Amino acid sequence: MTHLAVNVDHIATLRQARGVDYPDPVAGAVLAQLAGAHGIVAHLREDRRHIQDTDVVRLRAAARRFILEMAVTPEMEKIALSVKPDLVTLVPEKRKELTTEGGLNLARHGGPVAKTIETLHRNEIPVSLFIDPDPGQVRRSHDAGAMAVEIHTGAFCEAATEKIRQKEFDRIRKAVEVARNLGLIVNAGHGLCYTTIEWMVTLKEIDEFSIGHSIVSRAALVGMDRAVRDMLALIS
């Protein structure tokens, strides 16, 4: 059974836009869980543009399964060791990007990533790596000691033509196949919506989808409960 993890970052984005204390991403997380979400995701960015440190602590307490997305930095490593999420997903981070633009480049940054993985594993925190759908990056993830990968689906979701979308889908399919053959847990996310998910669910080897913006956007119109249930219906 493929699971759904709901990212609540953009509930916090709406809150931070006005500098108030609502809407509360923790309340959104609770509603998502009640609707059937299998996990809650939050990305604590270095610039704290949406999720804040206190959100992470409260989400850890409220979520049945909490996934922390974070950059490979000493500060974030310290926070992860304190909070002890159920899973850490290591992601690249650029200050000026609107959202994460690509996967980790393990050919360039494999050393620091492997060191962080070792530290977190030593403290019984499983680690996934957010990577582009590239077999080489999948193999490097395995070599670095990751137990899971999250395949970046952004290029597929943003494809301008059907031909490009099919090409990107084939890249994802190949990456998933390589990851499975290496014994990795395979997750996927970034840009997935109620339309693009229909392609992704044909890849039965994917263990979990991480979806945030499209669910939060739909929730603004129909409520979190229905938004999550509608996505779960498509996944199942």
Curated annotation (Swiss-Prot):
It is an enzyme of class 2 (transferase). Its main location: cytoplasm. Pathway: Cofactor biosynthesis; pyridoxine 5'-phosphate biosynthesis; pyridoxine 5'-phosphate from D-erythrose 4-phosphate: step 5/5. Belongs to the PNP synthase family. GO terms for biological process: pyridoxine biosynthetic process. It is found in: Cytoplasm. The active site is at 43 (proton acceptor), 69 (proton acceptor), 190 (proton donor). GO terms for molecular function: pyridoxine 5'-phosphate synthase activity. It comes from the Bacteria. It catalyses: 3-amino-2-oxopropyl phosphate + 1-deoxy-D-xylulose 5-phosphate = pyridoxine 5'-phosphate + phosphate + 2 H2O + H(+). One of its GO terms (cellular component) is cytosol. Catalyzes the complicated ring closure reaction between the two acyclic compounds 1-deoxy-D-xylulose-5-phosphate (DXP) and 3-amino-2-oxopropyl phosphate (1-amino-acetone-3-phosphate or AAP) to form pyridoxine 5'-phosphate (PNP) and inorganic phosphate. It comes from Desulfosudis oleivorans (strain DSM 6200 / JCM 39069 / Hxd3) (Desulfococcus oleovorans). Homooctamer; tetramer of dimers. Pfam families: PdxJ. NCBIfam families: pdxJ, PRK05265.1-3, PRK05265.1-5. Its EC number is 2.6.99.2. This is Pyridoxine 5'-phosphate synthase. Keywords: Cytoplasm, Pyridoxine biosynthesis, Transferase.
